[in-house]
């Protein structure tokens, strides 16, 4: 049986009418602008090879080959491909075949690969001049650490909401849907970190809850305060604050944003604040240690992996060096301890939304104050 091979070049969109050698049926084939072998047909034209097919489904095709095409039917971003859009596999990753078309100003603007990134470390305006779809990372301010004579509690991390590719949001939640933005101005609010409590010379108390960060319809809730002598339970927030000495009521994190704080398990060492990636740990008595802050989460929305939103460490009554809880990865402040050896707690790192470290006692001056949480951040990106 003779084979029909169609070769050549069509400028623009061309139409070839082919009569197979053993049938009177004409086969009409529409060709794009291309050069070389486009497709092969058997003798009667009933079987064609060389035609690219598109897989339409809500998950990325498994075991793809270079050049495979996929249309994302999901209602959210999957493997970095926005909803209702086409992608091609380049041999290592799925890449969007079409751009969002969005253009905007505001914040500090950088580029990474196919993306333009707007980073806001202080409040401002995201001005959209051409409508389109964006991904975002919105982190609130972290909670302040508490003060207690024997172990204040660490502040919780600010709420962590993320729509970047296959990354996660706080509290072990799935990535959120992307945002479709019309032209116009969108206020970006960066939440401040909550203040740590001053010892006051005679009694200690809780820290201050962090402030929320807001972008468009997305609000991340400020981190919960760390408990203190006068107000021992931890505060609720994006991630919860820890409970102060001799108290087991830690603050709760918000679903989809962060984890709970730790408690003091009936001893004189405060619990750690919750982080975006894990709960704060409890204070312990054997040995005497403040609870560690919960770990933060890493995101590559800027093109590089950065961990943010760690919980603050709890304070300890022990004068032993480093008895204060460790701050959670991502910028959580270290907890302090009693006495003068390495006792000073530290603040949450700015623009990470991390919780502040707690004080171990309040009898020896201002260095034993609970420390403030870190301010939040908003990062927005779209295909350039």
Protein language model features and the residues they cover:
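Fibrous stalk/shaft segments of extracellular and virion attachment machinery
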Residues: 2-13, 19-57
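Extracellular/surface-exposed low-complexity repeats and stalk/linker segments enriched in Gly/Pro
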Residues: 2-4, 49-80, 97-98
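A generic structural signal for beta-strand entry/edge sites
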Residues: 3, 13, 26, 83, ...
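Short, ordered beta-strand-loop transition motifs
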Residues: 10-11, 21-25, 65-66, 109-116, ...
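Flexible, charged surface loops at secondary-structure boundaries
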Residues: 23, 62-65, 181-182, 302
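Short hydrophobic/aromatic-rich beta-strand motifs
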Residues: 28-30, 61-88, 116-121, 137, ...
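Repeat-associated, polar segments at repeat-unit boundaries in modular proteins
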Residues: 35-38, 88-96
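Low-complexity, glycine/proline-biased repetitive segments and flexible coils/loops
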Residues: 90-93, 99-384
């Amino acid at each position: 049986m003779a084979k029909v091979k169609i070769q050549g070049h069509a400028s623009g969109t061309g139409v070839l009418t082919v009569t197979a050698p053993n049938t009177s049926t004409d086969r009409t084939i529409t060709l794009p602008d291309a050069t070389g072998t486009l497709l092969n047909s058997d003798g009667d034209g009933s079987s064609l090879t060389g035609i690219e097919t598109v897989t339409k489904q809500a998950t990325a095709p498994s075991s793809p080959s270079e050049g495979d095409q996929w249309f994302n039917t999901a209602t959210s971003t999957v493997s970095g491909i926005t909803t209702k859009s086409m992608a091609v596999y380049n041999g290592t990753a799925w890449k969007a075949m079409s751009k969002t078309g969005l253009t905007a100003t505001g914040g500090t603007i950088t580029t990474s690969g196919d993306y333009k990134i707007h980073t806001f470390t202080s409040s401002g305006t995201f001005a959209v001049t051409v409508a389109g779809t964006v991904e975002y990372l919105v982190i609130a301010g972290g909670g302040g650490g508490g003060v207690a004579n024997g172990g204040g509690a660490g502040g919780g991390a600010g709420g962590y909401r993320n729509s970047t590719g296959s990354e996660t949001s706080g509290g072990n939640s799935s990535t959120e849907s992307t945002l479709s933005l019309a032209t116009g101005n969108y206020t970006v609010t960066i939440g401040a970190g909550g203040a740590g409590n001053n010892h006051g010379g005679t009694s200690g108390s809780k820290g201050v809850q962090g402030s929320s960060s807001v972008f468009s319809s997305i609000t991340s809730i400020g981190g919960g305060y760390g408990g203190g002598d006068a107000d021992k339970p931890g505060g609720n927030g994006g991630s919860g604050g820890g409970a102060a000495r001799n108290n087991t009521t830690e603050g709760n994190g918000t679903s989809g944003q962060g984890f709970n704080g730790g408690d003091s398990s009936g001893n004189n060492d405060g619990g750690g604040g919750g982080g975006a990636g894990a709960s704060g740990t409890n204070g312990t008595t054997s040995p005497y240690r403040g609870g560690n802050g919960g770990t933060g989460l890493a995101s590559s929305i800027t093109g590089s992996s950065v961990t943010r939103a760690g919980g603050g460490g709890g304070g300890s009554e022990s004068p032993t060096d480093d008895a204060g809880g460790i701050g959670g990865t991502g910028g959580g402040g270290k907890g302090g301890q009693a006495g003068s050896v390495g006792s000073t707690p530290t603040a949450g790192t700015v623009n990470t939304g991390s919780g502040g470290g707690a004080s171990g006692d309040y009898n020896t001056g201002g260095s034993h104050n609970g420390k403030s949480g870190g301010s939040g951040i908003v990062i927005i990106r779209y295909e350039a």
